[in-house]
């Protein structure tokens, strides 16, 4: 079996790097982009993504917006979406779960978080 492929979406370079490195230490193939629009373009052309890990707070479109786009697409609806945020806001967390997110993890993402989120693949 080939390594799982995770799309990481975060507007902050450092956070993209931290999440990507944590995933790669678990033999995960990572594609990292800095915006929801870049993620949507990538998802439109790439068919072997197994999961999305997205920041919540980003300019223009949020991680929740990405979640909604994924869940309304017949081709993508099956993809597990994990929301990562430095904000521990119960209403936001509930909204993401209600929208179909598989998990909501607090940043910074730690190596110990990775096995849990990989279980969603």
From Swiss-Prot:
Domain annotation Response regulatory: ranges: 5-121
Keyword line: Cytokinin signaling pathway, Phosphoprotein, Transcription, Transcription regulation, Two-component regulatory system
Keyword set includes Ribonucleoprotein: no
Residues in coiled coil: none
Segments traversing the membrane: none
Entry keyword Secreted: no
InterPro entries hit by this protein: ARR-like, CheY-like_superfamily, Sig_transdc_resp-reg_receiver
Gene inactivation effect: Dwarf, narrow leaf and low tillering phenotypes.
Alphabetical list of Pfam families matching this protein: Response_reg
One GO BP annotation of this record: cytokinin-activated signaling pathway
Cited CDD domains: REC_typeA_ARR
Post-translational modifications reported in the UniProt record: Two-component system major event consists of a His-to-Asp phosphorelay between a sensor histidine kinase (HK) and a response regulator (RR). In plants, the His-to-Asp phosphorelay involves an additional intermediate named Histidine-containing phosphotransfer protein (HPt). This multistep phosphorelay consists of a His-Asp-His-Asp sequential transfer of a phosphate group between first a His and an Asp of the HK protein, followed by the transfer to a conserved His of the HPt protein and finally the transfer to an Asp in the receiver domain of the RR protein.
Modification 4-aspartylphosphate, positions: 55
Protein purpose: Functions as a response regulator involved in His-to-Asp phosphorelay signal transduction system. Phosphorylation of the Asp residue in the receiver domain activates the ability of the protein to promote the transcription of target genes. Type-A response regulators seem to act as negative regulators of the cytokinin signaling.
Similarity section: Belongs to the ARR family. Type-A subfamily.
Protein name, per record: Two-component response regulator ORR13
